[in-house]
From Swiss-Prot:
Keyword Transcription regulation: yes
GO biological process: aflatoxin biosynthetic process
Originating organism: Claviceps purpurea (strain 20.1)
Induction profile: Expression correlates with the formation of the sclerotia and thus the pigment production.
Annotated DNA-binding residue span(s): 36-63
PROSITE patterns: ZN2_CY6_FUNGAL_1 (PS00463), ZN2_CY6_FUNGAL_2 (PS50048)
Region of interest (Disordered), ranges: 1-29
Function per UniProt: Transcription factor; part of the gene cluster responsible for the typical purple-black color of the ergot sclerotia. The ergochrome gene cluster produces several ergot pigments including the yellow ergochrome secalonic acid and its derivatives, as well as the red anthraquinones endocrocin and clavorubin.
Stored PANTHER family: MONODICTYPHENONE CLUSTER TRANSCRIPTION FACTOR-RELATED, OLEATE-ACTIVATED TRANSCRIPTION FACTOR 1-RELATED
Domain of life assignment: Eukaryota
Regions crossing the membrane: none
Record keywords, A-Z: DNA-binding, Metal-binding, Nucleus, Transcription, Transcription regulation
Subcellular location per the Swiss-Prot or TrEMBL entry: Nucleus
Protein name: Ergochrome gene cluster transcriptional regulator CPUR_05433
Length: 488
């Protein structure tokens, strides 16, 4: 029996697809692929040059044109004979020179040699190929032997390189690092050790943690250890892959992102002012200077700091602390009104609430001066300062608080003007009640590009009521103090 490769290939019509069939008919004609094997796996355009395309020649990889089979009409027997003779010649050339990697039938030769060597006979090899076929006429699946897996695994990195090339022109040099980076994410994330605590804390500071910005220092200071323990795994995950990821991203991509983010410069400055206002609001709400406990130590300090009412200023530590805190708050709000974010309606609303807190502090400071505890404290100071009556103490405290209200009046006047400007850019509630939703949406989003006020969340009636309450609160406090001075 003749087991020569060329003879068997020529008898089967130049293809291995018809060899296992008992009919021997050329039902599914076969031919070489127009695209080489490397370009076909990479899903890229091939120049179709033979014996080696330009892409494979540039990369230095073997260029192989494998046999393909496509269902269709039967070919003309004369053309099939010509195709068979051409396949036989090319196959014989590949057998005579097995080291020629540019041969067209090199891949087919390896499969046939593996089939004959593993089976030991033609019939066994045909049976092995027959098991991979179906009776429905579907294309044959080529079997992969054990030694073929190593070759495919070795060439996998070369086939994946064109898929990564569009990301960056310099990314192909780092392809092995990119392929090996998957091992870093396969293992479970372990808690960070003590050596990485400094890096983790730096990463947490660079992140946008809203809770750390909104809460005051004394509130989130006690929970710093708990927050660090909860955020440690995520920080460790990002720090482990940050160096490799940043090295793989092109500089042009990063520069474009930075340029696009620079368009939000005005929005970020407005956000910074709003964050400062929220911080002031949290501190004003958390620390109440007007209701500090009346301890013996504070009582002695108050007695030592008091002065005689007649012809001298009288300031207790309670009033002094209240005045200093309110002055700092008013100064901070005044600086915000001079900034570029002075037309932000959210900032104006937050500043209005802070002004209400400041007025409440002055009211409580004036009320504490005539409370029972403070009166007892002043009674203890009588041996030192002489006969001090309660009316004199009330009058002195009321005059001090009344003298500080001009600072609040200036701030309220400026804040009221800003609220009036925001109301002019906001639709009226009465007119909007008769309009449709589409009309309202069009009116909200047709503001000029230069307008920095975001009035989509507050109506004109809300801003007007806020302005009215600010002026009314200041007038009520002044009126109460003046009426108390008239009664004394």
């Amino acid at each position: 029996m003749d087991h020569s490769i060329g003879g068997r290939n020529c008898q089967s019509g130049g293809t291995t697809a018809s060899a296992p069939r008992s009919t021997g008919s050329d039902e599914f004609p076969s031919k070489l692929r127009e695209t080489c094997h490397a370009c076909s796996l990479s899903k890229v355009r091939c120049s179709k040059e033979k014996p080696s395309c330009s892409r494979c020649a540039k990369r230095g990889v073997p260029c192989e044109y494998i046999v393909t089979k496509r269902p269709g009409r039967k070919r003309d027997p004369t053309k099939s004979a010509g195709l068979t003779s051409s396949h036989c010649k090319s196959f014989d050339a590949a057998t005579a020179a097995p080291n020629n990697t540019n041969a067209n039938c090199a891949w087919l030769e390896d499969v046939l040699l593996t089939d004959m060597g593993g089976s030991g006979g033609g019939s066994t090899g045909h049976a092995y190929l027959d098991s991979t076929q179906t009776d429905t006429g579907s294309p044959m699946l080529w079997p992969l032997m054990a030694n073929d897996g190593a070759d495919i695994a070795g060439d996998m990195s070369d086939f994946l390189m064109p898929l990564i090339t569009p990301l960056s022109c310099t990314f192909t040099a780092r392809t092995p690092d990119f392929l090996s980076a998957a091992a870093e994410f396969s293992a479970p994330i372990s808690p960070p050790n003590n050596h990485d605590d400094k890096n983790n804390n730096q990463s947490m500071q660079d992140g946008s943690n809203v809770m750390q910005l909104l809460l005051p220092d004394d509130v989130h200071g006690g929970h710093a250890a708990e927050n660090a323990a909860q955020e440690a795994p995520s920080v460790d995950f990002h720090s482990s892959c940050s160096s490799r990821s940043l090295s793989s991203v092109p500089e042009s991509f990063l520069s474009s992102k930075i340029a696009s983010n620079s368009d939000f410069g005005s929005a970020s400055s407005s956000c910074e002012c709003l964050i400062k206002a929220l911080d002031i609001m949290a501190k004003v709400s958390s620390t109440d200077l007007a209701v500090t406990p009346d301890t013996p130590s504070t009582r002695r300090n108050s007695v030592q700091d008091e002065a005689v009412v007649a012809g001298h200023d009288q300031t207790s530590p309670l009033l002094h602390a209240t005045f200093m805190a309110n002055k700092q708050t008013i100064e901070a709000l005044s600086n915000m009104l001079h900034g570029s974010c002075q037309e932000n309606v959210y900032l104006l609303t937050c500043m209005s609430m802070i002004v209400f807190k400041v007025l409440r502090r002055y009211e409580m400071a004036a009320g504490q001066s005539i409370s029972a505890g403070v009166l007892d404290m002043h009674e203890a100071a009588r041996p030192r300062h002489g006969d001090l009556d309660r009316d004199s103490l009330r009058r002195a405290a009321a005059q001090l608080v009344l003298g500080e209200l001009h600072l609040v009046q200036q701030l309220v006047s400026r804040l009221s003007r800003r609220l009036q400007l925001s109301m002019d850019k906001t639709p009226n509630d009465g007119a909007d009640s008769e309009l449709s939703d589409s009309t309202l949406a069009t009116r909200v989003f047709t503001l000029d590009e230069d307008d920095k006020a975001d009035t989509s969340a507050f109506s004109a009636a809300t801003l007007s009521q806020m302005d009215h309450d600010l002026r009314k609160g200041l007038a009520r406090l002044s009126s109460n103090i003046i009426n108390m001075l008239r009664r004394l």
